């Protein structure tokens, strides 16, 4: 009798473990959302397996990879644990392709200021168009995927962060990009890992943006922390954007890492996951009007270079 009881107890325990493992399984599906000449653009959807059969619509994180508009992968292994974390928190995560226009351009064509400025603008425009097409694809499948199209959060790393921020900037200024999306659409929030906005002249916001979460190191030599300007065209970094948001009293969460470079384009996906969830729960889904700035100080980096020139940024991005 005793042995039988132990056997039954062990069987029940194994069944419970199997149930938990099954409940935590992440389902991944890949879809083609656009074909543009030689480029077939795909996206990967991640969702908790036990949420697929639910009835409640879920918020979505639309992620764009980094890679300097020269490369990168939507399924980079370094991103997957971040996607799974968000999926377990109740989000549908969509990681999208976009065309990387700088990969096929001879570096000699953008080695000078004007050439670099022109090539970068074209690459950003192309990436943002594809990001918008991925957004439309999600909206078109919102019923089938059981997602809430009013709760799509744009997210990106480095070049992908520029893409996500630029998409929001274009919507707020009612440009031709906004016409590609449904009427009155806006992202519910943006999470930027070392991003910037590309604008001719100082950025202007016709409409206030959605809540923004901006991670940036003030020693970043790849994407400017504050700004990098070539005549009229400039890349306006997280610090500059945050100053504008503060004046407009628009909700934001700005995370500054002093003495840190471009590693903030990926490290928050591991080190700041709960900060990200707090932003999503409070400022995005909870619609709290908060202006939050967190400064990470490192005593070991008391002396560091942060006054980069436009030439410094060009050299770094031509590697």
Description of each model-found segment:
Residues 178-249:
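The feature captures the conserved acid-bearing segment of alpha/beta-hydrolase catalytic domains
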Residues 23-56:
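N-terminal cap/lid segment of alpha/beta-hydrolase-fold proteins
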Residues 246-319:
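C-terminal catalytic histidine-bearing segment of alpha/beta-hydrolase fold enzymes
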Residues 68-71, 93, 137:
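Serine-hydrolase catalytic-loop signature spanning alpha/beta hydrolases and amidase-signature enzymes
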Residues 74-96, 103-105:
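Short amphipathic alpha-helix adjacent to the substrate-entry channel of hydrolases
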Residues 136-208:
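Primarily recognizes the serine-hydrolase "nucleophile elbow" in alpha/beta-hydrolase
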């Amino acid at each position: 009798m005793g042995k039988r009881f132990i056997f039954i107890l062990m069987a029940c325990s194994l069944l419970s473990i199997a149930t938990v493992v099954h409940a935590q399984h992440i389902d991944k599906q890949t879809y083609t959302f656009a074909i543009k000449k030689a480029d077939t653009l795909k996206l990967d959807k991640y969702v908790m397996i036990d949420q697929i059969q639910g009835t409640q619509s879920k918020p979505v994180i639309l992620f764009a990879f980094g890679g300097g508009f020269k490369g990168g992968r939507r399924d980079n292994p370094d991103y997957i644990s971040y996607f799974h974390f968000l999926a377990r928190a109740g989000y549908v995560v969509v990681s999208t392709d976009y065309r990387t226009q700088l990969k096929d351009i001879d570096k000699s064509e953008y080695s000078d200021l004007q050439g670099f400025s022109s090539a970068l603008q074209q690459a950003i425009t192309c990436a943002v168009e594809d990001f918008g097409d991925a957004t439309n694809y999600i909206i078109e499948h919102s019923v089938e995927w059981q997602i809430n199209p009013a709760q799509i959060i744009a997210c990106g790393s480095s070049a992908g962060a520029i893409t996500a921020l630029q998409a929001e900037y274009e919507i707020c200024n009612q440009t031709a990009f906004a016409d590609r999306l449904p009427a009155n659409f806006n992202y519910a929030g943006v999470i930027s890992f070392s991003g910037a906005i590309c604008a001719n002249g100082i950025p202007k916001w016709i409409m206030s943006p959605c809540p923004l979460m901006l991670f940036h190191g003030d020693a970043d030599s790849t994407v400017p922390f504050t700004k990098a300007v070539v005549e009229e065209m400039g890349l306006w970094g997280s610090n500059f954007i945050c100053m504008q948001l503060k004046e407009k009293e628009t909700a934001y969460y700005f995370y500054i890492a002093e003495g840190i470079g471009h590693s903030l384009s990926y490290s928050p996906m591991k080190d700041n996951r709960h900060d990200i969830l707090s932003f999503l729960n409070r400022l995005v889904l909870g619609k709290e009007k908060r202006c939050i700035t967190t400064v990470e100080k490192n005593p070991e980096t008391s002396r560091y270079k942060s006054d980069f020139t436009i030439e410094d940024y060009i050299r770094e991005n031509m590697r």
